């Protein structure tokens, strides 16, 4: 699962989080291969995601690592790491980021991004969003200069028992076949039931069950919109 790039708000995705930092591990079963047998015949069924958000006096650091699995073991790994520097007491932060990874068949081209994030939180911390316009450098491309716009959001319901969160990205890229410019879109909304917020469940049993729906255009399949749902478990630390 390609999870949010700029989750400045990630600490709030675990409702009323105890420390001022957050990390989790997710396990997803992906139905994309069954739904698009012709377009995605080898799409991995299993993916794990590890995420961490850590704020400090200067801003915050966020990263995630996705690992896809085949019968033989890990098939590919992809990660993104970002650093944000607070701009005084404003809701803005300077943003720098690296994206890259590899698989047993190819390596992902490196991408380097720089931009500015705007973040908003409700006073109750029950809802919020970020938006980040960025310059994007596509390494090893004949036309490396590009752009990306990223948005993230979260909303808690039912006294923190339910969380709706996710991200949306749109960016300029190059077609793998002919090198022409194209625009890629992807969004991955997630819906979680946080079991540790239910009556009678120990709050230290920090398991969530839920789903993610990857909606993309020009991402998984060129010139086509694809919807890949998952069933998922998440343990928050």
Q: Model features per residue range: what roles?
A:
Residues 40-44, 69-76, 102-111, 137-146, ...:
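Solvent-exposed loop/turn segments connecting transmembrane beta-strands
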Residues 19-21, 58-60, 84-95, 121-129, ...:
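Short loop/turn motifs that connect adjacent beta-strands in outer-membrane beta-barrel proteins
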Residues 225-237:
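Outer-membrane beta-barrel "beta-signal"
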Residues 1-24:
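Cleavable N-terminal export/targeting peptides
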Residues 29-33, 67-71, 98-102, 133-139, ...:
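Transmembrane beta-strands of outer-membrane beta-barrel pores
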Residues 20-70:
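Short glycine/proline- and aromatic-enriched beta-strand/turn motifs that initiate or cap beta-hairpins
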Residues 138-208, 214-216, 235-237:
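Outer-membrane beta-barrel transmembrane domain signature
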Residues 50, 81, 114-116, 149-153, ...:
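Membrane-embedded beta-strands of outer-membrane beta-barrel proteins
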